[in-house]
Amino acid sequence: MTAEHDAAILPKPGGPLAVGKRATPEPGPNDVLIEVKAVALNPCDYYQRDYGMPPVPIYPAVIGGDAAGVVAKLGSSVTGGPVPGPGSRVIAFASSFYQNGSPDHGAFQKYALAQSEAVIPLPDNLSFEEGAVFPLAVLTALTAWTTIGIPLDTRYTPADKQAVLIWGASSSVGSFAVQSAKTLGFTVYATASPKHHELVKKLGADAVFDYKDSDVVSKIVDAVKKDGVYLHTAHCVVDGALQPTLDILKETKGDAFAKVAHSPVLPECHPTLDNTQITFNFPSMDEVVRTRISKLRRAVSRE
């Protein structure tokens, strides 16, 4: 471990990122210092860079949340439990946002700190590149349900006839959204490009539709009515999903109160629908470390 390391530094709002040197930090009591081998890019990374959303309180900044690498050093309070010792392969949710913008956290650097609760072992059968896509994608997919009031221990049965629409199901977040929706017991209607339909079905979707089809709204509505299920819940995973989602819910929810989790940042003047709650899906770190990391561990261990 060197005294300094390379980092992709954001010097000011709007960027651009520049490679520079940073002092390699010592981990705090509850931190894990990780030698980063791979990172994943997420839409929130360019939101932070270009728009300061989530807020960036300190510049120069280091952004990025998803990291995979090797444990370099443990904080003094990190003993036992699920976090392995130095030299072990791990994945981590290392966002600086949840650490008041501290640039010692943030995935886009060679050595990054992460809270111990947000670090889990990386199975030997997964590469660093494969492991890096897990943290934020899984957490975002799971947080969507609790954001709209669906506990993660929900288990609908076929008799409940509860359905959900996932728009953008072949993305990293969307693929985990499909799998978690099936675990909750939903009948899952999903959209994706035709080349991804078989994959999305294997993940658990009951029906998959081409989002570019000019008749996609009517086709989903017809399928829901034919199947005799109740569709008044949705997760908009990608930009541009909200209006067609609301068009579908307008025809399927009846008099029921509908709920939509929206993972991209909501535009200021976004479309609305009567008797429908539309909520920006934003994970809080308290929720992450208390209720979701165990779910992430189980998801990774199954790979």
Swiss-Prot record:
Coiled coil regions in record: none
InterPro entries the record matches: ADH-like_C (IPR013149), ADH-like_N (IPR013154), GroES-like_sf (IPR011032), NAD(P)-bd_dom_sf (IPR036291), PKS_ER (IPR020843), Trans-enoyl_RdTase-like (IPR047122)
Induction statement: Expression is positively regulated by the azaterrilone A cluster-specific transcription factor tazR.
Key words of the record: NADP, Nucleotide-binding, Oxidoreductase
EC class name: oxidoreductase
Sites where the protein binds NADP(+): 44-49, 170-173, 193-196, 211, 246-247
Known EC number: 1.-.-.-
GO molecular function: nucleotide binding; oxidoreductase activity, acting on NAD(P)H
Record-listed substrate binding positions: 136-143, 265-269
Signal peptide range: none
Gene3D superfamilies listed in its UniProt record: Medium-chain alcohol dehydrogenases, catalytic domain, NAD(P)-binding Rossmann-like Domain
Listed pathway(s): Secondary metabolite biosynthesis
Region (Disordered): 1-26
Domain of life: Eukaryota
Family statement: Belongs to the zinc-containing alcohol dehydrogenase family.
Task of the protein: Trans-enoyl reductase; part of the gene cluster that mediates the biosynthesis of azaterrilone A and other azaphilones, a class of fungal metabolites characterized by a highly oxygenated pyrano-quinone bicyclic core and exhibiting a broad range of bioactivities. The first step of the pathway begins with the non-reducing polyketide synthase tazA that assembles one acetyl-CoA starter unit, five malonyl-CoA units, and catalyzes a series of Claisen condensations, methylation, PT-mediated cyclization, and finally releases the first hexaketide precursor through the R-domain.
Identification of the protein by name: Trans-enoyl reductase tazE
Organism expressing this protein natively: Aspergillus terreus (strain NIH 2624 / FGSC A1156)
